[in-house]
Regions:
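N-terminal lobe/hinge region of extracytoplasmic solute-binding protein
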Residues: 1-44, 75, 449
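Ligand-site clamp/hinge motif
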Residues: 151-197, 342-344
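Append "and occasionally in soluble cytosolic enzymes with long acidic Gly/Pro-rich linkers
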Residues: 146, 227-333
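Short, well-ordered beta-strand elements
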Residues: 1, 48-51, 70, 101-103, ...
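Periplasmic binding protein-like
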Residues: 62, 179, 316, 337-383
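Detector for C-terminal structural segments
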Residues: 235-270, 324-333, 357-462
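Aromatic- and charge-enriched surface segment that lines or borders ligand/interaction sites
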Residues: 38-81, 224-226
């Protein structure tokens, strides 16, 4: 259960009792607040972020928590199973004194703390099964957490018990049974996962918002979807409210822009401009000279490089490992075909899906990605980016991504061009479900926020 390698949602619940980050990122507004840090400042050029640690912070053994511990932790998290390349723009991490951490980046960053919700461990403890942390509890064997008598914070933890019992399970059905018999009081789960097991006892249900985006991607080298006028029309054809409510069971937020609607730079007015609107869909197709030229019921597009018109047809691929994404992709395909497209949906196993993306063997795809907390889109538009499929590398978009990192007010220009050109079509952002036995815990996301925001997962299938 290492904080950098653990992928189990429920096991990561436990980590919030054992460890603390420099900053916490709220799932309510995607803004960073200090925890182990007391403050930070950014240099005028945006390339250096200096973080000041709380002088009273210490580990559970009573030893001081230093900037060297923080530097070691951030460096150790790079390339791990859970944190991957989250800090890809960070070129240097070093302690300048006992309580001052200095980070340098290869591009200007307005708010690097959005990426610093990584648990801090003791210097030199990376290879330990359960490294020393600074949280309000410590492990006592495999099935019990006890209060950390050296906890540096003066306020009581939100979950204020002398001990927390842990239950070992192997299957989701065992999670369900233990929750229904009240052996377990809290369960964190993805209600749209194939492994989800529903509950039937009396419970309270909370949702936790995430930067996990589902979207439509395109092969812009194809003869049909190379036309950005056609691609940009598709945003108007997607009923995102229907997908979020009926396909996702309400555990999602419809999103026209590639950021959570809760993010401070999500522009609702801009989103409304490109939202579901069949009148605008028809107008955009008309402006792109897309029409049913031979009256066969399928739209046609004149391709200048060919010298003749082709049907607006193609294949959308989706990873078969998620029944929810298959269902959502099916809805998208049906909606487009009802409007004159001729799209075939093809489900592929994970390895086949990845290979098809990498080789460009698709026209469209329905993907899912865990974006970083600042919703950086660089991996889509950099030639070396891990999400750059179907010829998506674009120097103008890459420059706009860089400008958005330097000042999130620049996100407007990035998102406007993305919608106008139809590089990708955002659909929704997923939520997780937090189940608690009634009356046992109040506002559970308050104390588990720091790990509920996943790192960037650079695979389109999530």
């Amino acid at each position: 259960m290492h904080p950098y390698d653990c992928e189990s949602l429920n096991n990561r619940c436990i980590l919030s009792f054992l460890y603390e980050p420099l900053f916490v990122v709220s799932s309510e507004n995607f803004e960073a607040s200090p925890v182990l840090a007391s403050s930070y400042e950014v240099s005028d050029d945006g390339l250096t972020t200096t973080v000041h640690l709380r002088p009273e912070a210490c580990f559970s053994d009573g030893s001081p928590l230093t900037a060297q511990d923080a530097a070691y932790s951030l460096i150790s998290s790079r390339g791990t199973v859970y944190y991957g390349s989250r800090l890809r723009h960070v070129t240097s991490i070093a302690a300048s004194d006992e309580k001052t951490l200095v980070l340098t980046t290869d591009t200007a960053y307005e708010c690097l703390p959005l990426l610093l919700d990584i648990p801090i461990i003791k210097d030199g403890s990376r290879d330990e099964a359960v490294p020393l942390g600074s949280g309000p509890y410590v492990m006592d064997g495999d099935t019990r957490l006890v209060r950390n008598t050296n906890w540096w914070q003066t306020a009581a933890p939100i979950v204020d018990f002398a001990e927390v019992k842990l239950t070992l399970v192997e299957k989701t059905s065992e999670v369900r049974d233990n929750f229904e018999y009240e052996n377990v009081n809290l369960v964190l789960t993805d209600p749209n996962s194939a492994a989800f097991a529903g509950f039937h006892n009396d419970y309270e249900l909370w949702d936790a918002r995430l930067p996990i985006m589902q979207y439509i991607g395109y092969n812009i080298t194809s003869k049909v979807f190379s036309n950005y006028g056609l691609r940009s029309a598709i945003t108007y054809a997607i009923d995102r409210d229907h997908l979020a409510t009926d396909i996702m069971g309400g555990f999602a937020q419809p999103a026209v822009l590639p950021a959570s609607p809760q993010a401070p730079f999500y522009d609702g007015k801009l989103a409304n401009t490109y939202g579901y609107n069949l009148t605008k869909f028809s107008q955009q197709l008309e402006s792109a000279s897309v029409e049913d030229m031979d009256n066969d019921g399928t739209l046609d597009l004149y391709v200048p490089s060919l010298g003749y018109a082709v049907s607006v047809a193609g294949t959308m691929i989706v990873c078969s490992s998620s029944y929810q994404r298959v269902e959502a992709a099916t809805e998208v395909v049906n909606a487009l075909n009802a409007l004159g497209f001729k799209i075939t949906l093809k489900t592929l196993e994970l390895s086949e899906f990845r290979q098809a993306l990498q080789t460009g063997n698709f026209d469209l795809y329905y993907g899912e990605i865990r974006l970083s907390n600042n919703f950086d889109l660089t991996p889509f538009f950099s030639a070396s980016g891990s999400m750059c499929y179907g010829g998506l590398d674009d120097s103008v978009m890459l420059n706009l991504c860089t400008q958005a990192l330097a000042n999130n007010g620049n996100s407007y220009n990035l998102y406007k061009r993305l919608c106008e050109r139809g590089y990708i079509t955002p659909v929704l952002f997923k939520n997780l479900a937090v189940y608690t036995t009634r009356g046992s815990i109040a506002h559970p996301t308050d104390y588990i926020d720091w790990f509920l925001i996943p790192p960037a997962d650079e695979t389109a299938e999530g």
